Amino acid sequence: MSDPAQEVEAPVEAAPVASSPKGKKEKAPKAPKAEKPKSDKPKKPKAAPTHPPVSEMVVNAITTLKERGGSSLIAIKKFVAAQYKVDVEKLVPFIKKFLKASVAKGTLLQAKGKGASGSFKLPPAAKKVDKPKKAPAAPKPKSTNKRVTGEKKVVKKPAAKKPEAKKATKAAKPAAKKVAAKPAAKKAAAPKPKPAAKPKKEVKPKEEAKPKKAAAKPAKPAAKPAKKPAAKKAK
């Protein structure tokens, strides 16, 4: 008989679990996130500012206050709040930024202090630019008046040409006189028919005396009829 201790079977070794490379655990693939639908609500338009730019407000405050030692930040804030009716505390960072940048550029002068805590004023050149100078523009129309007078002189020069027209009229008048003289010549030729008055001369007392001679000499009356043709020549 066999020994029962020998008949006991050896325990079966468990197969080793396959390990992932580099000892890392495999992550399950994530499901893609569903995109959120975009809202169709229209964006609200930005409200238009009810005040001018900060730079304009600060410069206006400094020019209006006209402080010899310059305007401080507190004075500028009070002026802006009273003039433009805005929340100055919200604008303080922008005011300080503008003051520092303007001092660096030279558009503002810092009379006292450092940074934005001092007092500020405009440079002399900027004050001259701000003053409007419209007075020199007034004399300009005078030069235009001179040009107009010069044009008038040019207009007067053509008036000197009028004597030429007079000469033309004078030259036309002698021609008219010549035309008028021609009828006078015709009138001078008209008196030619006056010789018709000659027959009056023929009626002379001498002719009346001739019959007396005929009475004395009866033989001569035969010759008188021959003298009648002489009267035709007078016509």
From Swiss-Prot:
> Any idea which UniProt keywords this protein has?
Chromosome, DNA-binding, Nucleus
Query: Which BP terms in the Gene Ontology apply to this protein?
Result: chromosome condensation; negative regulation of DNA recombination; nucleosome assembly
For bias type Basic and acidic residues, the affected ranges are 26-42, 199-211
Q: Quote a single Gene Ontology cellular component term.
A: nucleus
Q: Which residues form the H15 domain?
A: 50-124
User: Do the record's keywords include Nucleus?
Assistant: yes
Location comes to: Nucleus; Chromosome
Protein name in the entry: Histone H1E
